[in-house]
Amino acid sequence: MMSFLVSIASIAMLVKIVLGTFANVFIVLVNFTDCIKKRKFLLADRILTVLAIFRFDLLWIILMNWSSSVFHVGLYFQVRFCICVVWIVTNHFNTWLANILSILYLLKIDNFSNLIFLGLKGKIKCPYIVLLPCFVLLFPNLIMVTICETTQANGHQGNLTGKTKLTYFTNLIAMTFTLGSLVPFTTFMICFLLLICSLCKHLRTMRLYGKGSQGPSASTHIKVLQVLISFLLLFSMFILLLIISDYNYTKSLEEPIHLICQVIGTLYPSRHSYILLWGNKRIKQAFVLAMVQVRARFWLKEKKP
């Protein structure tokens, strides 16, 4: 029964990673192709491209962690520290770049008359200032990983105190990761609430002048809101499943709850890439065109005798 569950979970994990990889590679190719053609690389496109690259790395790190922990446990304990460090770095930048992208989407809305937003629109051309907290908050996570790995090495030597510390620090690193995600998550929630306020203000203005609730500005608000809500749900689910998985990690790598949490948690990096693809009009059009061309080629091959 356990081997059957592992097989089903592995197939589901592989399918999600392949689909997520396809979306991220497509985003990078479309952005680079447009950059070469137009000789112009907008800030939002640059951030989206870097996010897709980090998302690609994260997906394959997740696959490496899965295959080594489930099928090669001995190998897993040898490469665990390297996988953990790379996973934390890639996931950290994934979270922050997605957060910065949501800020850019917010600042695209021209409905704000607040001086803070007018100032931000002028300074957002320098994203390095926004990325500064990202680099600062990365170091505590890496320090906690090093402490956790040292404690785990002592715990495997049969020291009861070390084993107790192993459980403590494994749980502590999960909490450190959660706290490290608190800043971008809070920023994201502020953007989300401000966008709702902006939409309500816009709808009131439209109704006041008898223009109804339809219009390009309202459509832009709703589209950005849909992207942000999707990210909010997926990221919240990812954090919750990560905490549950880490608390069960100290019991067994093959605990059903641990396997299920990992498989469902992969929805965040794989599905969110498609949401970003759908939310970008230019990339969405290229994706639809590519799918139509692929379908036409298959149809022509089937028609040939």
Curated annotation (Swiss-Prot):
Residues 31-46, 91-99, 149-176, 245-305 are cytoplasmic. Keywords: G-protein coupled receptor, Membrane, Receptor, Sensory transduction, Taste, Transducer, Transmembrane, Transmembrane helix. GO terms for cellular component: membrane. It is found in: Membrane. SUPFAM superfamilies: Family A G protein-coupled receptor-like. Coiled coil: none annotated. The chain crosses the membrane at residues 10-30, 47-67, 70-90, 100-120, 128-148, 177-197, 224-244. GO terms for molecular function: bitter taste receptor activity; G protein-coupled receptor activity; taste receptor activity. InterPro entries: TAS2R. GO terms for biological process: detection of chemical stimulus involved in sensory perception of bitter taste. It is a multi-pass membrane protein. Disulfide bonds: none annotated. Putative taste receptor which may play a role in the perception of bitterness. Belongs to the G-protein coupled receptor T2R family. Several bitter taste receptors are expressed in a single taste receptor cell. This is Taste receptor type 2 member 136. It comes from Mus musculus (Mouse). The lineage of its organism: Eukaryota, Metazoa, Chordata, Craniata, Vertebrata.
